[in-house]
Amino acid sequence: MRRRGLLLSALSGSACAQGPGGPLAVPFSIAALPGPIRPLGALQINTQALGFGGLSALHLDEGLLLTAISDTGRWFRAQLLLRGEIPAGLGPATTGMLRDGSGETLSRGRPTDAEALARRPDGTWLVGFERWHRIRAYRSLDAPGAFFEAPPGLANAPSNGGLEALAMLADGRLLAITEFLNDPADASLRQGWIGGPGTWRPIRYRPAAGFAVTDAAGLPDGGALVLERRFALMEGGFSARLVRVSAAALRGPDPIAGEPLLNLPPDGPAENWEGVTVLRRGAALWIGLISDDNENAFQRSLFMLYAWAG
């Protein structure tokens, strides 16, 4: 979901892919704070060099290939470059437009608002869309996108408050959470689902007061991380928090709420944080976050990387 925000920082040189608009990404550091999660570093993505912004969801695989989608219906893939464990830049990007079932690129506007991304064990990509609420399945992101059975009731979501979080859980089920589809009996709860085609089960998720869910990622233990965002113009603009939801909470009938792991700020810069990804890296879990600049010169497209003992 689009928001307004902070001033864009000037870009400088970096050891990463160079395009007509300059380097694709510029590294910067994140201050370490007490807590279970250790910051490894961050990148500012040069959307002029990339050709678009609006990055709304991401995936980082075991080979450190970063995949992201945009709410303008575009996608890109690039290798995450490291110096030791520190993000140093991005390799050359492959980009494209998401397509419909016939292979035609999605029409501009309402059909292109891609907000959620998950990868199934067989490599299929699932992309969740707002405004026209639906899920499409892609064998590869440059292939036609077939309709994937959406959770029952998703069509009732507000136009700009639909499916923001779509995560593959360790047991093969999907976790789907809406941004602003309230529970009819309790407006502090958001409607969501766990399961898949033919097995969707409704759940209720409780974000922190004033926050909205923007993404989720499954954990190896069967739980999940959920990213929540808040925008309050008179209180400094954006803030976000990353919470851990236990596997037991996802199995039970009660409303789901998470245990905070990160608060942004102070655990990282204030921005429009929209995407989260998790991968196992040695003994630690690496957590990646991405922000959506809304293709607005006063906001930034940032990627941050953290290590967590889990």
Residue ranges and their predicted role:
Residues L7-G310:
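Sequence/structural signature of beta-propeller domains
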